[in-house]
């Protein structure tokens, strides 16, 4: 088992799995629970096949919650969206290395600097088939890594078991480079009460849970149980 020396566990319910016909109530479940983060998936139907919501929705949600807004940009051009989501009330923004590294229209370091200059936490996300090595050179500049444990785009998918080894690899790198107090590992996708402990033991300390929370009979109880693992 990898020793997780990072700060305490963070549960980040993913609003993508919520009932959008009663969004205020769904957000209040999170407000009334022990969670401190709310995960907001932003999709443009280009980088991923789904389309979610934009900065105006985030701005409206901000009026009803003081939680840490963790904005996950699953978009083909994250740089052009940064200002809108910063202004909408994001507290942290993650972008996909696959949308930046390969083409260098806006190199990752430019996005990192812009996010950090706005006094937000900055994360880099990697898809299941993307190796960790591609983001090693950016680790000292960011606050968290998002390990996608499902293919990004849709809620309710099954957890990809190989994600455990990737988390362990990243945790070892973080500890060896003395970045333990700086960089968190977020695991996003297929997180359930029955597998969350394995993810934590592998070294993750931020768990994004969508369907497990919002499709449960008691979302508040589900969040609180996960938070106590």
What positions do the PLM features span?
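Conserved N-terminal beta1-alpha1 strand-loop-helix module at the mouth
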Residues: 2-94, 99-107, 114, 122, ...
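Conserved acetyl-CoA-binding loop of GNAT-fold acetyltransferases
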Residues: 90, 203-205
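Glycine-rich beta-strand-to-loop/alpha-helix junction loops that act as flexible
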Residues: 187-190, 208-211
């Amino acid at each position: 088992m990898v020793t997780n020396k990072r700060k305490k566990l963070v549960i980040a319910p993913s609003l993508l799995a919520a009932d959008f016909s009663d969004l205020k109530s769904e957000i209040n479940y999170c407000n009334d629970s022990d969670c401190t983060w709310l995960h907001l998936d932003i999709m443009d139907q280009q980088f991923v096949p789904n389309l979610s919501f934009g900065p105006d929705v985030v701005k409206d949600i901000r009026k009803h919650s003081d939680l840490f807004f963790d904005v996950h940009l699953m978009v083909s051009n994250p740089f052009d969206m940064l200002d809108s989501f910063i202004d909408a009330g994001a507290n942290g923004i993650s972008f996909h290395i696959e949308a930046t590294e390969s083409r260098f229209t806006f190199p990752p370091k430019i996005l990192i600097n812009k996010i950090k200059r706005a006094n937000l936490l900055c994360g880099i996300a990697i898809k299941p088939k993307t190796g960790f090595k591609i983001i090693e050179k950016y680790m000292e500049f960011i606050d968290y890594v998002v390990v996608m444990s499902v293919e990004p785009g849709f809620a309710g998918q099954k957890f990809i078991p190989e994600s455990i080894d990737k988390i362990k690899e990243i945790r070892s790198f973080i500890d060896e480079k003395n970045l333990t107090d700086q960089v968190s590992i977020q695991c996003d996708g297929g997180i359930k009460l029955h597998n969350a402990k394995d993810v934590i033991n592998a070294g993750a300390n931020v768990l994004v849970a969508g369907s497990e929370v919002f499709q449960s009979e008691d979302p508040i109880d589900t969040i609180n149980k996960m938070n106590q693992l």
